[in-house]
Amino acid sequence: MATNGFRLVAVAGSVRSGNFSSKALALAVDEIRKRHVEVEVIDLARAHLSQPGLPPSEDALRIRKLVSEAAGVILATPEYHGSYSSVIKLFIENLGFPSGLAGKPVALLGVAAGQIGAIKALEHLRGVCAHVGAVVLPATVSVAGVQKLFDESGRCLDPATEKNIRGLATSLLDYLHNNVCPRAAMEEFVRSGSTEWMKHWAGSPDAARPSGTL
């Protein structure tokens, strides 16, 4: 399965050097690129985002454009004090209103040092993303005890964790393949002015049925 022609955006909600959110996200990004799909990784540590209520910065406008043009988004967050990071919240705030996430499939990845993982962070982040109109994928990945699962170079030491994170990436690609690609192809087909789709429909069994018989 390939989703060529689409671009995804990946965001890690931590600005700490060597943070585990970025290490986990890198596995998902690698899986996406293995499938020949372009993905733009937004480094929030290098972005100068605006505080809510202030005019958008140049970086905010650039990020809005990247997200608006993306087919889907992966958000990775650490769990801080029972919720997602303020960095991710500021990222979402800088996407404007209506949000750049509106109508887009979003995959969520959470990491935490504790035994229960980032369940609370993901629950809260799901609610916010849904509130701004994102299509949040049902499956999320919560990584518990993350400090034991990655080495300093970013290599994952646990095959099961790596499989789950890569699976999140493929879930997003599968969603795009099954739901976004066919719609985009049909829209392009219709915009081209071609009438071939009408001929195909006219030759189908459904075309011969009178209205009210379905």
List where the protein language model places each region.
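Glycine-rich NAD(P)-binding loop of Rossmann-like domains
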Residues: 5-7, 101-103, 151-157
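N-terminal beta1-alpha1-beta2 submodule of the flavodoxin-like/Rossmannoid cofactor-binding fold
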Residues: 1-97, 160-173, 180-214
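A broad detector of the eukaryotic-type serine/threonine protein kinase catalytic domain
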Residues: 13, 96, 106, 110-111, ...
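Residue-level signal for beta-strand positions within conserved beta-sheet cores that form or flank
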Residues: 4, 35, 102, 137-139
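Mobile beta-alpha loop/short-helix "lid" or hinge segments that flank ligand
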Residues: 39-50, 97-99, 132-152, 179
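Short, glycine-/small-residue-rich phosphate/pyrophosphate-handling segment
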Residues: 30, 105-145, 156-163
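Short, charged/polar low-complexity linear motifs in solvent-exposed/disordered segments
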Residues: 120, 126, 154-155, 169-170, ...
